[in-house]
Amino acid sequence: MWSAIQSVLKQIDDFVWGVPLMVLILSGGLLLTVRLGLLQVRKLGLALKWMVQNEEEGEGEISSFAALCTALSATIGTGNIVGVATAVCAGGPGALFWMIVAAFLGMATKYAEGLLAVKYRVVDESGHSLGGPFYYIEKGMGKNWKWLAKVFAFFGACVGLFGIGTFSQVNGISSAVVGFFDPDKSLAVTIPGLGTYSWVVVIASLVLTFCVAAVIIGGVKRIASVSQIVVPFMAIIYFIFALALVLFNIKEVPQAIVTIVQAAFNPKAVTGGVVGSMLVAMQNGVARGIFSNEAGLGSAPIAAAAAQTKEPVRQGLVSMTGTFIDTIVICTLTGLSVVITGAWQVEGLEGVQVTTYAFQNGLPFSNQFCAAVLMICLVFFAFTTILGWDYYGERCLEYLTGKDEKKIKIYRWLYILAVFIGPYMTVAAVWTIADIFNGLMALPNMIALFALSGVVVKETKRFFDVYADQKMAKKKSSVSVKNAAKN
């Protein structure tokens, strides 16, 4: 039965992530990159500076850094550890190249999303700042496009329940925990109607369900406070170990880069025809890249709208750093690790097992230690992603049904139920379902970004004209003070 369902899901996935959607996502990022004059390169330094610098004025509930951490909590997850490995195994090393290309263009996309989220956000009767694609579609494109905003909100709520938010994250956690505590699956238990699983899976599902339920009841501020502490710390830990792996194998890096680039355009020359065409490499790279950094998906703007700032451009730049950290840095290191160690070519490995193999064979530490580090990173990454996506899903539901506490509570309980179910699903089914809903969610958002690209360019020019004048005035004032001091 599962094989038949998986076959149907794969066909739907291939249709959703066909050439049209990939062209839409890549061309949207390219359009914004060109119209903004390579802003993701020119203003990256300023963006990183503002990322950790709070702005005290302006509407909003949380700092820009807290908003970024909330967004990063939803983006830095299993996609960085499991998703990259899955993409390279399915699409060859070339998938990493297309993932990086999509992320570079996606930085401009994420900038536009953050800018529009703040520009078109609203404040409800409770004083909460609300925003995201549904609001910039409705207010920016006009009331006639409200149906498109509702389509986005519907699929956004579904992605939270069935995609990135729950199934893939808890499945990744349970796989990592089982791989560490019960690699031989000797602690087996048969669950009627479901199959045979390790007791570790059962315990993990119960513990995860309890922890998630305890946090999401607190809403965005509790999620933000947890994310602010956990996300930066765990990202640094994972970055150090992944970078160490690359440095310990630095002699292999040039050949790995050649392999990645060659496989991006001619996969058969590298894989011997096992993986397939350039389209397969591109499809896996772009799809997994979107899963990881969410640029173009429309999720991050929902968190960006809660940032305490009066300048849409400023928050757009801060949002942009999320894609840089998530994919350009973390995913690239994971991908290099998998290619350098040849983990992607080892038969019988899937998901987190591929990355675990890379760490165990690429670092001069014991297998148990490497597996423990990876498990801890994956658990925390995935846990914060689960929290972030509950917030996204609730905002989508609010847009569809209004501020109905009863419906929000029902959504939360369904979300908690999905967390409980996730560990018992197959890895293939989990990732296919996530890809399908990602694509359906990205489509209306990318249409809006094309339509509102002119607004993004105009708002950017206005801000930096004023910013340049302010810098000049500040410089003149500083010179005047120095001259007065000399006299």
Regions found by a protein language model. Name each.
Residues M1-T78, V88-A95, G106, F420, ...:
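N-terminal alpha-helical transmembrane segments of multi-pass membrane transport
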Residues K10-L46, C89-H128, L148, D326-L333, ...:
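Extracellular loop-to-transmembrane helix junctions
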Residues L24-L31, L39-L48, V170-V177, W199-V261, ...:
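Membrane-interface loop-to-helix entry segments
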Residues G28-T33, S73, A102-G127, F134, ...:
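Helix-loop-helix module between adjacent transmembrane segments
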Residues T33, E113-R121, E125, A242-T259, ...:
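Extracellular/periplasmic helix-exit of transmembrane alpha-helices
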Residues L38-S64, T86-V88, G92-L96, I100, ...:
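Flexible loop linkers connecting adjacent transmembrane helices
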Residues E57-A90, L116-G140, V151-F154, C158, ...:
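Alpha-helical membrane segments and immediately flanking helix-loop junctions
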